[in-house]
Amino acid sequence: MQSVAFMIDLSIKSLRGILMKQIKRLFQIDPWKIRTTHLDKENLRLQESLTSIGNGYMGMRGNFEEHYSGDHHQGTYLAGVWYPDKTRVGWWKNGYPEYFGKVINAINFIAMDLQIDGQTIDLATTPYEDFSLELDMQNGVLSRQFTIQTPKNKVRFSFERFLSLEKKEAAYIHLTIEMLEGTGTITLHSKLDGDVQNEDSNYEEHFWEEIAIETQETLGFVTTKTIPNNFEIERFTVTAGMRHFIDGASVVPTYTQQPLALTAELTVSLNEGETTAITKEVLVVTSRDVPETQQITRVNELFSEMTTLYPEAKAGQAAAWAKRWQLADVVIEGDDEAQQGIRFNLFQLFSTYYGEDDRLNIGPKGFTGEKYGGATYWDTEAYAVPLYLALAKPEVTKNLLKYRHNQLPQAIHNAQQQGLKGALYPMVTFTGVECHNEWEITFEEIHRNGAIAYAIYNYVNYTGDQDYLKDAGLEVLVAIARFWADRVHFSQRHKQYMIHGVTGPNEYENNINNNWYTNTIAAWVLRYTRESYLKFQEETTLKIADDELAKWADIVENMYFPVDNELGIFVQHDTFLDKDLMPVSDLPLSELPLNQHWSWDKILRSCFIKQADVLQGIYFFNDAFSLEEKRRNFNFYEPMTVHESSLSPSIHAVLAAELGMEEKAVEMYQRTARLDLDNYNNDTEDGLHITSMTGSWLAIVQGFAQMKTDHQQLKFAPFLPATWTAYSFHINYRNRLLFVEVAADQVAFTLLDGPAIPLTVYDQKYTLKDRLVLPIRKEEVHV
């Protein structure tokens, strides 16, 4: 048995040196821009990830428009377009999914290869100067400039591109060419290139086949379709169209067809001091919205609607982003690193998802890479829902819930595959059918089911929308509850219900028994579902027998939760305390991250925790635990946590803030806010950590400002981090819009829209009618 002294010793060990290990910062610090004047060829994949753009309908990595022969990861992705790749495992087990769904690299429509007097421009080999790259987060425009010197001339190229928020199918690529010295002819080969493949494809497999290539004077079209599959899964057809303008005038290029590709050639000759501008407009439609036979017609219709020139389109893009930022922006004064981090994360989140389509969810990588297959995980419900509730209309979050409700039949199928009743929502999915093929995740990481139920509770508690609970949410809850009731077993020896053979949120342990978090959320689901059913029993068509309700109540009353009274903690699972317990700070820095240096066997036997596990449950059910229980568990588990999941730092930031551990809270905020910008986990080159980007917002709003909505009441207890001079944010809550400002000496709440609302600040109750200003409370800071 470990001593209390050991627990306290762990709690005071700092991870500061570990967090600073191998930070890789490619871009300058700027509140609104991601900018560099250095082309880092050794880290171009990382640079491409960090300059990704999207509009919820499609997105792409920050690839160059012109040909680049060096190492890079070309990637353009379309929401909801994927391919079922045959599951490949060494040892097949009953219950495995037949296929692994993966987002597939789609048509490369930004390609604009360049030649100066016949010489191909390739920044991997061509000498260049005056390079700059900038992502402007205020308007979503990615720009890049460079100058090429040849024996005959000196030419400046300036690219801009964006994916339209006003017309989701539209993309704009704008190239300005300046002849600084001499004269010359610039040849542009603008392409729609469907001959692409995934970075992770097996044996260089291609997922697309050509359907049609057409030209209509100024317009060019390429239609491709995903190759047949063996699983009767829908095939997707995609049509991309392009047209070009030179100095605002429409042009008819010279077209050349290749397999799966169309090239439009444009040529301009410039004298010294002359400048020209070429705009490429692209439209992309998919069979998710437009049948294959109607796609070229639809693209033509969309082109006819696009009557503005590039400057007006760019201004419209800026206005659309300004509307989103007006509600979503978090302003931090006194710390530009922190400011850049939160804005970058919010920008990428809203580039990935804004709730327009209830057939879509949020993949962990969004449109920025192919890792994790681009599919949906439980991350959305656990981490993204609180942010979208506060920063968007309720319909946005409701669409996330509809996504899961629509897939309930498939979740029931997943449970049946494991021989269980009810519904088991998948760990990885596009359609609701499980796509993950690792047994310790597919079969055992069943706590994900609880996150789906918790998101329903979170939505109803935050919005007050009882009709959704009655009309749709309850059906999902009942199916999940039936799964848990069947998955538990009754221990005759202990006379309690237990759950064996699971993987908790800490994926650095598999096949464990009685994971505290899993047992806790299972019991909570059964309780919440039972209470909700009894509330609407007379109004719902769902029927639950009295003996089933009684069984649920018995499980809740007699669920086993591992605890240690000497340490005063909830035990992560039955045998966790038998491990060789030590803090992460005792490890050599050269061995971190563990998942890149240790064998999987060594990780599984260690005490080290990938992400919040017990603390995840304390975060979810915060008001069920005393401050002392929170403190003891935080001090015990956090020092053993390596935070090698991007989802981890935010939960620790929120809890540390509540416990008065300001330094730890800020440290965790910095990690979650700049996880990708500083490449903390040394894996951002594979794509951004989109769903965990909500963590920086959670750390500020639920952590530093201590916003809570327990029992349908809005509460705050803000503090100001020592290195900041002020911060502010907006909150949508039950048809009200609030503006919260936290400064060194005061905190202010302004009701910008909606009726008066009860508000609790520092445990004192107020009614917010217009503006409330209070002195900020100076809390005792704990280590």
From Swiss-Prot:
Pathway: Glycan degradation; maltose degradation. Signal peptide: none annotated. It is an enzyme of class 2 (transferase). Pfam families: Glyco_hydro_65C, Glyco_hydro_65m, Glyco_hydro_65N. Its EC number is 2.4.1.8. It catalyses: D-maltose + phosphate = beta-D-glucose 1-phosphate + D-glucose. Keywords: Carbohydrate metabolism, Glycosyltransferase, Transferase. The active site is at residue 507. Substrate binds at residues 378-379, 610-611. InterPro entries: 6-hairpin_glycosidase_sf, 6hp_glycosidase-like_sf, Gal_mutarotase_sf_dom, Glyco_hydro_65_C, Glyco_hydro_65_M, Glyco_hydro_65_N, Glyco_hydro_65_N_sf, Malt_Pase/Glycosyl_Hdrlase. NCBIfam families: PRK13807.1 (NF010380). Catalyzes the phosphorolysis of maltose, leading to the formation of glucose and glucose 1-P. Does not have maltose 6'-P phosphorylase activity. Plays an important role in the metabolism of maltose taken up via the bacterial phosphotransferase system (PTS). This is Maltose phosphorylase. The gene is malP.
